[in-house]
Amino acid sequence: MTVGIVGLGLIGGSLAKAYKKSEHTVYSYDIDKKILDFAILSGAVDDILSFENINKCNLVLLCVYP
């Protein structure tokens, strides 16, 4: 399954790690570029979620403050 996650805070980051641990493909986006870069370098996500790859996602999770 391919998952897109918007927001890599406490909830989004935890979900990204859990889906990645279950060997799913994880795309993610965060407003803070440093957090997004760290998530990619640490292996928590596969790539940046963008308009080009959002159509590949079976599930998109919005994990931002209301």
Q: Positions of the model-derived regions?
A:
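NAD(P)+-binding Rossmann beta1-loop-alpha1 motif at the extreme N-terminus of oxidoreductases
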Residues: M1-F51, L59
